[in-house]
Every structure is written in structure tokens, then in C-alpha cells.
Amino acid sequence: MNRSHRHGAGSGCLGTMEVKSKFGAEFRRFSLERSKPGKFEEFYGLLQHVHKIPNVDVLVGYADIHGDLLPINNDDNYHKAVSTANPLLRIFIQKKEEADYSAFGTDTLIKKKNVLTNVLRPDNHRKKPHIVISMPQDFRPVSSIIDVDILPETHRRVRLYKYGTEKPLGFYIRDGSSVRVTPHGLEKVPGIFISRLVPGGLAQSTGLLAVNDEVLEVNGIEVSGKSLDQVTDMMIANSRNLIITVRPANQRNNVVRNSRTSGSSGQSTDNSLLGYPQQIEPSFEPEDEDSEEDDIIIEDNGVPQQIPKAVPNTESLESLTQIELSFESGQNGFIPSNEVSLAAIASSSNTEFETHAPDQKLLEEDGTIITL
């Protein structure tokens, strides 16, 4: 009677598959429908639920019919494991931080281990675990030039990483104007420029940005038509992984692409930037000369600071003006006005605006200083 009952139950469960999972010294058994095993993510969640480890990252492996321990990490090898299970699917679970990756491979389950040798062998003579090179984790990303294959040679897209470092981004930006050659003639358009680099900052240490580089995009968003404050907010919001597209002031150091197979960040295609004319005519108006009084300073110590302004004599002031004019006339044409410091942009987006007294000469049209 009992035997016939078992036979009947077995014939009625031909569509089910028994699963035996092992996590540490703990074993669990459950059943799945062989015809509808579901997806790997569902199976992964089921294993976590059965073993009561919902917040633990694990590696899942299974024993195939040849005695090999093979990984299960996607839908394809999960369905392969289900199809080869006859009649039992044996699952082995390891914590990721304690996983032995050398256990995966051919004949890994049928090899006999000499337990006595392992017990008697001193710890200093034990075999060290293999170095994992197939599943790297926590690589430190570095700043780099990206999207060389889709940008014009006159443009440069720079990715600045603050990952794992407390270095500030370390550059100042300002608004100004440049004169571009268009089919309709010379056209004066507003723009955002890098005015200064902070020694020891991320921008200077990487060497990817320079003074007077014109900022065209911030993380795939064009800065054309945006104010200096808006561009500053965009950079602050993306300071941990800042991607800036610039037109370098020194075009001789541009990266010349010789292949269409170089890496791409997938951030955005530059159909709009392809329309930018490559030749820029210098234009500088003395009455719009850059003034330290119009600087906006971003600091990370919570104390607003005003850039000190030296008062030279008339003779040295005239010579300094001539030097600035001769230097800036060889770069992209611009007419500087206001300036924002990104010397110490932090990851926090909490921004305080403090209004200064009327006797303080700082950004007269706004009367504010940005403090991080």
C-alpha cells in the first residue's frame, strides 16, 4: 500500500525537479517545476529566502553530471543547470567575500582531499588561495579623455573622477564671449571658460584641462544659453563623476584620432557639437577687462572669502594690462566678465547664499557669495 502510494506520487510529479542547496554546513531541499524554472534572479532570491540570508551577496554554483562545479550567474547557465539535473539539482552557495573561485572548473567535486595532510600541515605551509583576476572588483577609476572617435578634433571630452580622493576639482570658471566664424560672418556669442587652475587640484594634476579652455558641455548637457550659476550648479551636482566637453585653448595638444574603434563613454553623441565652427577669432574689449571684483568663490571651509585685490601703481598696472592683452589675444576670443571658483567643490549639494553689505565689492549685480 505504501509502495503503490509512492509510485503514484512519483508519477504525478514528473514535471517537478528536486533541488538540494548547501550553504556552509546548512542544507535545504525544495522543488521546482522543470518546465517553468523562471529566471535566475527569481531563483537567486528563492535561495536567499530559503537559507534566510536576504542581504548577503553570494555566488551560486551547481554540480553537473560530470562532477564539475560550474557557476550560475545568468539565465542561460541557470536553464542549462535545470536541463541537466537528473534527478537532483545540487546547488552550492558561497559568500562572495569568502568565495573560493578556484573551486569552479573541471573535476572539482570528484577530487579526493587528503584531510589528514591538511590537519597536520602547519599554517605557514598551507597553500595560499589563487589570486582572482577574472572577477575584478573596486578598481580605482582615473581621470581620462573619452569619446575621441565621435568628437571633432578641436574638442575634448574629459572625465574627472573624485573617487577615493579628497582632492578638490580645482579650477575656476567664468563667463565671457567668443567670436566665431559662421556662414553669415563673424558672430559674437557668450560662453563659459576656465579662468584658473588651483595648484594640487584634480584638474591640474591630470593635465587634461587648461586656462582659457571653453566649456561646451557638462555631463552631456550643453551650457549654451545657461548662466554661470546654472553651469556651477551642474558641476556641483556631478562633481563625483564630472564629464566636461571643452574646446582647448591650445589646439596643438589635441588628440588626433587614427581609429574608429576607440572607447566611448556612451554619454551622448555630439551631433550638436559637430556644427561648431573650428576657427575662433580673438576679440577683447578693454572696457570689459576681467575684474577680480566680479569673482564668485566656492569654498569648502564654510567661511566666505573675498579674493584680495592688489593695488599696483599706474605704471605697473599699464604694463600688466599689456601683458594680459598680448597673452589672451593668442587664445580663443573672449570677453571675460564674471568668474566662479570650483577649487573646492565637494560632493555635498548643500549651498548657502549669504548677502554681503553694500560696501563689499563682490558681484554687484547679484550681491551673493556661494559657500559649500
From Swiss-Prot:
Extent of Polar residues compositional bias: 253-272
Cellular location(s): Cytoplasm; Cell membrane; Cell junction, Tight junction
Keyword Phosphoprotein appears in the UniProt entry: yes
GO cellular component: a single term: bicellular tight junction
Annotated ranges, domain PDZ: 157-250
Chain residue ranges for the region called Disordered: 253-292
Subunit structure as annotated in this protein's UniProt entry: Interacts with PARD3. Interacts with GTP-bound forms of CDC42 and RAC1. Interacts with GTP-bound RHOQ/TC10. Interacts with PALS1. Interacts with the N-terminal part of PRKCI and PRKCZ. Part of a complex with PARD3, CDC42 or RAC1 and PRKCI or PRKCZ. Part of a complex with LLGL1 and PRKCI. Interacts with PARD3B. Interacts with ECT2.
Protein name according to UniProt: Partitioning defective 6 homolog beta
Organism: Homo sapiens
